[in-house]
Amino acid sequence: IDTYVESGEMNSTELKGDGFIPCFQAEGIHWSFVRLDEKGKVAEVKEKKRISNYCTLGAYYFRTCQLYRDLYEAYYRKKPELVNGEKYVAPLYDYLLSQNGEIYISDIAPEKVHVLGTPEELKRFLEE
């Protein structure tokens, strides 16, 4: 994971549903994105396609390890859709939604999230 989230911003007591995705709001298109329904539950998750302002942090929760394993095997066996030639976790959440799973997010304040994915981002973080 190439993201640092300040201490206290992510709490296991928030975890609920079949899946849970910590998010923050940011610019750009190099994220996975989450769209919520009118009740605040996840309605859609897309990799590298901006469907809302909610960007995933790259940390993901599934209710059980077995659920993750089952989703991975079923999705990539039936629908091996790759994004830029790579496998991502985001499509597993969309697949979980198609199986009537419930997924929630947390919305972490952007100033508490420090992206470290490039040398420039790391340098900026170290200088702060």
Cite the ranges covered by each PLM segment.
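Catalytic-core segments of class I nucleotidyltransferases/pyrophosphorylases
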Residues: 42-114, 120-123, 127-128
